Amino acid sequence: MDKKAARIRRATRARRKLKELGATRLVVHRTPRHIYAQVIAPNGSEILVAASTVEKAINEQLKYAGNKDAAAAVGKAVAERALEKGITKVSFDRSGFQYHGRVQALADAAREAGLQF
């Protein structure tokens, strides 16, 4: 099993458990250059809020889009947008990525901005 298959396996297991709970999910995906965050409805069919370093508004504030500062900016943006829509509680879905570095920076910034998880 290669590294990507192992990550997808971990993500699938976590998502199955979150689906049983029926929770709104804050999903994170990262690539070497960018990081993406989405708040997905409990049924999994609707994206309620999204933010990423690809967006012009966020990317203009950053020197480089693949570091912890960029992840924190995305976390803050997604939390603010979620709070505007009345979403305060979410479950954190790290998509099989290790809770470290950019993933942790995004989560911490979202918590500081007011999301609860």
Curated annotation (Swiss-Prot):
SUPFAM superfamilies in the cross-refs: Translational machinery components
Keyword Aminoacyl-tRNA synthetase appears in the UniProt entry: no
Keyword Ribosomal protein among UniProt keywords: yes
Cellular component terms (Gene Ontology): cytosolic large ribosomal subunit
Cited InterPro entries: Ribosomal_uL18_bac-type, Ribosomal_uL18_bac/euk
One Pfam family named in its UniProt record: Ribosomal_L18p
GO MF entry, a single one: structural constituent of ribosome
Alphabetical keyword list: Ribonucleoprotein, Ribosomal protein, RNA-binding, rRNA-binding
GO biological process, any: translation
Assembly notes: Part of the 50S ribosomal subunit; part of the 5S rRNA/L5/L18/L25 subcomplex. Contacts the 5S and 23S rRNAs.
Stated family: Belongs to the universal ribosomal protein uL18 family.
PANTHER family: 39S RIBOSOMAL PROTEIN L18, MITOCHONDRIAL, LARGE RIBOSOMAL SUBUNIT PROTEIN UL18M
Its job: This is one of the proteins that bind and probably mediate the attachment of the 5S RNA into the large ribosomal subunit, where it forms part of the central protuberance.
Listed NCBIfam families: L18_bact
Name used for this protein in its record: Large ribosomal subunit protein uL18
Lineage: Bacteria, Pseudomonadati, Pseudomonadota, Gammaproteobacteria, Enterobacterales
Gene designation per UniProt: rplR
